[in-house]
Structures are given as structure tokens and as C-alpha cells.
């Protein structure tokens, strides 16, 4: 009987030592230095993907796993602000990369995607956004339409 009890104790001790090597991992956000990263349930770092925060906002994780901030992401279709939050239902003014100076205006809909190559009605006015997503002004689309200096489509004769 004594040997059986000792064997059970030894078996329990071995089993508990094996359990020490198993690490439970909770998915979620973690700060690593100056960067925020997101881990899956299996402990792997999420990369090149969107993750939704508890407050409902969306953030993008770059190829390194770090949360992107203040930049274009996901094939330049989305923009995240200084807090890493996807811009939605907003205008954004960005330094113009096609000219030596100036700015371009972009509009992001409720899904956060930059409007590209289409007309968008905003507050009852129509704006056209070109292939880069920048708001167009002047004569556009083979000189068929005219958009004033603030991008609003002009209709009728003046």
C-alpha cells in the first residue's frame, strides 16, 4: 500500500512538472517598446492585417507586427491617424507627393476606404476623386465636368 501511494505521488509530481511547460496565451494588444502589437490565441504576432479594438475602432498591423500610425496602409486604400485608428467618414489633407508643394484632399467613407475613381456626394455636393484618391479640381473626365477650387462639381450655365 505504501508503494502504491508513493507511485501515485511520483506520477502526480511528474504530471505537474509537465504542465509547467505549457503556457496559456491570451490574445490581445501588447506594448513592445514604443510599438503596439497584437497576438493571436496561439501566441503568434498578427501581421499585415486589421484588428478591431474594444472601442470599435480599427487598427492596422504592419509586416513587422507593429501597429501603423499616421500613414497610408493596406495598398494605400486606408489611412490611420497618429493613434493608429482607421479614418472613417472624414476628409483628410495630405502633403502632395505628385508636386513639389501643396496638399491633396481625400475622403474616407464609413468603411474607411479612400474614395477612388468615382463621384461622391458629401453634404449634398458632388466631388470627384481620381485614381490616387485625391479630390480633383478644374476640368475633369475628358473635359466633361468642371469642379471648382474646393472640388465641388459646377452645374448649369453661369
Indicate where each model-derived feature is located:
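Extracellular adhesion/carbohydrate-binding repeat motifs centered on closely spaced tryptophans
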Residues: 2-158
Amino acid at each position: 500500500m505504501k508503494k502504491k501511494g508513493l507511485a501515485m505521488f511520483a506520477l502526480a509530481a511528474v504530471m505537474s512538472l509537465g504542465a509547467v511547460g505549457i503556457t496559456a496565451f491570451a490574445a490581445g494588444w501588447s506594448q513592445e517598446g514604443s510599438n503596439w502589437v497584437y497576438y493571436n490565441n496561439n501566441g503568434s504576432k498578427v501581421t499585415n492585417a486589421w484588428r478591431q479594438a474594444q472601442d470599435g475602432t480599427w487598427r492596422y498591423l504592419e509586416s513587422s507586427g507593429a501597429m501603423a500610425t499616421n500613414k497610408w496602409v493596406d495598398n494605400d486604400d486606408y489611412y490611420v491617424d497618429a493613434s493608429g485608428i482607421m479614418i472613417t467618414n472624414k476628409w483628410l489633407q495630405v502633403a502632395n507627393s505628385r508636386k513639389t508643394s501643396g496638399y491633396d484632399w481625400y475622403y474616407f467613407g464609413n468603411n474607411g476606404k479612400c474614395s477612388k475613381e468615382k463621384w461622391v456626394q458629401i453634404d449634398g455636393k458632388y466631388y470627384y476623386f481620381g485614381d490616387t484618391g485625391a479630390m480633383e479640381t478644374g476640368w475633369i473626365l475628358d473635359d466633361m465636368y468642371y469642379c471648382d477650387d474646393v472640388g465641388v462639381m459646377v452645374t448649369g450655365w453661369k
